[in-house]
Amino acid sequence: MKRKNYTTFAAIHLGSEMLSMQITEYHNTDRYKVIECCNRRIRLGEATFKNKIIPFQLVSEICEILIGFKRLMKEYGVEEYVMQATTAVREASNQVFLLDQIYNKTGLVVDVVDMPKEIYTKFVAIRNTLKAEKVSTEREGMLMMDISSGGLGVTLVRDEKICYQGNFHIGIIRIKESFERNRRESMHFNKALTEFLSSTIGPVRNELGDSKVRYLVLSGTETELLLRMLGLDEQQKVHRIKAADFHAFFDSMRQMSLPQLIQVYKLPENVAELVLPTVLLYEQLLHLIPAKEIIITADRFIDGIQLLHIGNKTNPVMRKELEQELISLFHTIGARYLYDKKHAQQVERLSLIIFDKIAKAYGMGEHERLLLRATCILHDIGKYICMRSHSIYSYQLIMSTDIIGLSEVDKEIVALASYYHANRLFDKTNTRAPQVEKELVPVVAKLAAIVRLADALDRSYMQKIHSCTVTLKDNKLKVLAASKEDLTLEIWTFDDKSTFFEEVFGIEPILERVNK
């Protein structure tokens, strides 16, 4: 019987190796209970990574399993659900047909998440587990490595800030499918695979430099296999292992042949084939950065789906903490391209004052506020490439960067707003201008118009305005800027840039200086 004031929620994950559902009754992030778990093995990864298509037989199998899941959802009285698909579906050329069949046969809507969003969802779950375990990054940082069937996410966290984040297409199943069977059985395979992995993750080594961390946090689908081989309880939420013990384990694994692995660890051949890629990948990752302790968590992608859903519904404190971590990542990206931090922070501060005054009336909420902050921080990073036409390079750099927590559409909005804060929208004479899809025009225009005004208020890059208030009355946005400095350049630039804001919002911006 459902508890009073509790909501029943189903999280469904269509992964590369497993189709899973978790049904939960929740009141908030502290008061919830998982009441049903279903896991059905499907081998999408092996088919998709090699042939880029999901066979018809698997499509039918997926739909049959989901029909069963729907019956369970009805029995439990599920009121809310989120269904997400990851790597295998994301890369399938027949993705559209799969999603259409799922919807027509089950009524379920599937959100296909991109890799940065996938890594972020896992990051949220792991972060929550480590906080419960009192694992802190205040003094000594941690490097989080999530390995899935099709990808690898590497995140460096120090002082509760994301200092580095990178994602790579080298998951365990993908590695296995990258080499034909006769190559995997070659006596040269170990060396070739080691060199392949080393060259692939080389950029991470360069980015991390001489960084040191206390904790190396491992998660992902293959950690269950690792725990089994280490003789540890797979059901336990967190395992802590000394780095030296981990290295010793890998040394022993590297010496074993496939038949020996099957015999010693009682593994099926198809599972034993994954051991060597797993061991060699972990070994390469361990060499990236010295760590004193290895932490292995049992958190799955589906746990992240659940936590994000419940947190967004019930926990504003958690939402704020997660937002601040994303802001730290935006600044990390800005610093990589030698941005002017003081200018970025000033533009962000002034933009938010304007945004908070007009957001509700113009259909903007918390998510648009986050995208605005990202735009303010990153709008000038193109100057790292070239001072002339820097906005096109800002657009290209943002589009080329993985930003966990932002979807591809979110990232495109930030990139476009960064470009159009300095360029005219719908300028047909500008052949280099990135195209804006029709449905994105309103949000891109609104964010770009706000950043354009705020940028004008710091045109000198000298942060002359130390405080600012905004009033909105009779379609006039009055900006009262407090400063003891000469604001002539800012006033002139504000007047030049205000036309676009007026076109977008139907509000006339007026700047008044206040001597304070």
Region spans (language model):
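Short coil-to-beta-strand
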Residues: Y32-I42, C163-I170, L322-E323
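Short, surface-exposed alpha-helical segments at coil->helix boundaries
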Residues: A92-L99, I491, D495
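Helical "lid/coupling" subdomains associated with nucleotide-phosphate turnover
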Residues: F9, A47-R71, E75-Y76, A88-S93, ...
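Gly/Thr-rich phosphate-binding beta-strand-loop-beta motif of the actin/hexokinase/Hsp70
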Residues: K2-I35, A132-Q165, G220-T221
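Low-complexity, glycine/alanine/valine/leucine- and proline-rich hydrophobic stretches
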Residues: S460, K464-L511
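N-terminal glycine/serine-rich phosphate-binding loop of ATP-dependent small-molecule kinases
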Residues: M1-A10, L14-S20, T24-A85, L99, ...
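A structural preference for short, hydrophobic beta-strand core positions in alpha/beta folds
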Residues: M83, V112, I296, L511-R513
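Short flexible coil/turn linkers enriched for glycine and charged/polar residues
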Residues: N5, G15-M18, E75-V78, N104, ...
